[in-house]
Amino acid sequence: MKKFSIILILFSLATVSCSKMLDVQPTDSISASQAIKDKSGVENAITGSYNALHSTSIYGRYQVIVEDLAADNLIWTGTTQDYSQIANHTIAADNGIIDGIWSLNYDCINRVNNVLSRIPDIDMNTDDRNLYTGDGLFMRALCHFNLLCYFGGIPIKTQPTVDLSSINQARNTVPQVYDQIISDLLQAEQLLPATRTLGYASAFSATALLARVYLTRFQQTNDPSIAELAIEKASKVISNGGYTLSPDYAGLFNGNATESIFEIVSDVQNRTLLAQYFFPRSLLGRYEVSPPANFVQSFLLTDTTRFIASIAFDTTKLPYGFKYKDITAGTDRVYVLRLAEMYLIRAEARAYSNGNIEDIRNDVNVIRARAGLDPTTSTDYNELKLVIENERRHEFAFESQRWSDLVRTKRATTVLGISENFTLFPIPLSELQTNTLMTQNPGY
């Protein structure tokens, strides 16, 4: 993996408008201006950027698994040693999975930047220009936010990396990265349409991601004005987005899309291998990860709806993650943003800023009611914070949320028993070797 970052730069330059892998020699490489020369080229490049989110290292596998494996919803039960390091919080700088998350998020950013740099020169109508610009800004913000949550301050990339001479870039500060993410999303919110085909971002996708970003920034700064922004954006999605909670939790993973704000759509061309990594070997899976006993036992006896949709057992009573079921074709949907999160974002922002107790309970109880649980009646802020944490743990199990939840609320050190340094992942060795201005995170 040592030269993975350089390889990805070359690859993205050679395939800027492609949605498929091509075997291209360096002499065949073409510039963005050559590849993206009309509206069709822009559309293809945007599709290729969305497909990059589907890559193995982002929502196709690694990032989804790492969020629960680095926390307490999954344990390592397979043969891939890089997963063992993540589960045991002994991550080396040359860990291939962490390297992949870093490199492929930046690859998606570079693809988007190539498109955004060309859009002003392409002849197209205003609606199309706004649409594709909004797409690019949304994806750039999402990938920068992924990297920020895992690595802290990172280099902000808003221009294409056109050759290897431009890879040396120092880390921006955490506030600077937040400012860039928020700026991109506020623009995307204005440029994108209110409704969109599944798998593509809408204006409300940008609003929902803003709610998540504001909540995370609030938890780092304790600035109540930022909590209000998180509440405002979550409320906008809840009230105006036209989404409805799936009446049946299991329906979320069996075709019901009324709750989906943004998701990764899988098909035979863009498969996800998540089911293979969760399913036991008796069911032809790899069983690289599995829910530990303490997580299995953490579900309330009345929380049967979420339990049955999340965890299953083979004939030997071996537990395994069950949200991703298509082990043959790999067409499982992967949620990035859905409506339930907006209720819990609003509840968390209010709970941590001493908001109205009844409003907090109401939002939590919407989610509990769907799960078939009795409403919480707590009147204590600290109790409600733990109720929200617990709801998120079970509501979003295996949906790329748990690690970020614990780090955001500063609970990772207590819940996981790790040092503060290890709430960030190491900067990959490949990046340190190729970017002379990069510095490693403390403790690695």
Segments and roles (model prediction):
Residues 1-27:
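Bacterial Sec-dependent N-terminal signal peptides
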Residues 18-65, 91, 375, 414-444:
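Membrane-proximal, proline-rich intrinsically disordered regions
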Residues 32-33, 60-78, 165, 193-209, ...:
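Short, surface-exposed recognition loops and adjoining beta-strand edges that mediate ligand/DNA contacts
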Residues 43, 51, 81-151, 187-196, ...:
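Conserved, well-structured interaction surfaces
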